[in-house]
Regions:
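Hydrophobic/aromatic beta-strand elements that line small-molecule binding cavities or substrate pockets
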Residues: 6-8, 39, 63-69, 87-94, ...
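Intrinsic-disorder/low-complexity, polar/charged segments enriched in Ser/Thr/Lys/Arg/Asp/Glu/Gln
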Residues: 1-7, 49, 62, 75, ...
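Helix-adjacent hinge/juxtasegments
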Residues: 59-71, 76-79
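Short beta-strand segments that buttress and anchor functional surface loops
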Residues: 50-56, 75-82
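Beta-strand/loop substructures that line and gate deep hydrophobic ligand-binding cavities in soluble
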Residues: 79-133, 149
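Short, cysteine-centered beta-strand-loop-beta hairpins and adjacent loop/turn segments enriched
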Residues: 55-61, 109-113
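Hydrophobic ligand-binding cavity/cleft-lining segments
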Residues: 1-45, 137, 148-149
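A short, structured loop/turn motif at beta-sheet edges
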Residues: 14-15, 42-45, 68-73, 91-100
Length: 149
């Protein structure tokens, strides 16, 4: 299993950051390698079930995410199934009038087990870069003058 974790401070209220991230269609607009994120249903816990298509190192991976822990304006924990398997955790923490948003993921490195020791470090670096870009894109989108209101 591989775990990556990054955070960013955003000059926007927690509610706005959480609402934006809670919309599955927004994920493909801020995540470079995510080509599709489609809402399948809203769950009884308030979270979502969504379908994803992710491109990693020239390969296409698809599956579903399901919000298994959903606390509005605080956190969403996703279980990821399909070609990629693991857990994604989002935390939104208020800091005065801003939000500290944390993205953490734990997942299996795809591919045959005997290659994972070789591909693991490459996949880790790729995903660390992907998450940093996602967080920068989220910050830019929510702090832009067009995002006000």
């Amino acid at each position: 299993m591989l775990t990556v974790r990054e955070h960013i401070d955003i000059s926007a209220p927690v509610e706005r950051v959480f609402d934006y991230m809670d919309t599955p269609a927004h994920q493909a607009t801020i995540t470079p390698s995510l080509s599709e994120s489609v809402l399948l249903e809203r769950l009884p816990n308030g979270g979502s079930r969504a379908r994803y298509t992710y491109r990693l190192l020239g390969l296409s991976f698809s599956g579903e995410v399901r919000a298994t822990d959903y606390v509005p304006n605080e956190r969403i924990v996703w279980t990821m199934t399909g070609d990629l398997q693991g857990t994604i955790r989002w935390y939104a923490e208020p800091i005065e009038t801003r939000c500290r948003f944390t993205y953490a993921a734990t997942y299996r490195v795809p591919g045959p087990r005997f290659l994972q020791s070789l591909t693991g470090p490459l996949v880790r670096r790729y995903n660390e870069r992907e998450i940093r870009t996602l967080l920068r894109n989220l910050k830019e989108r929510l702090e832009s003058p067009r995002a006000a209101g």
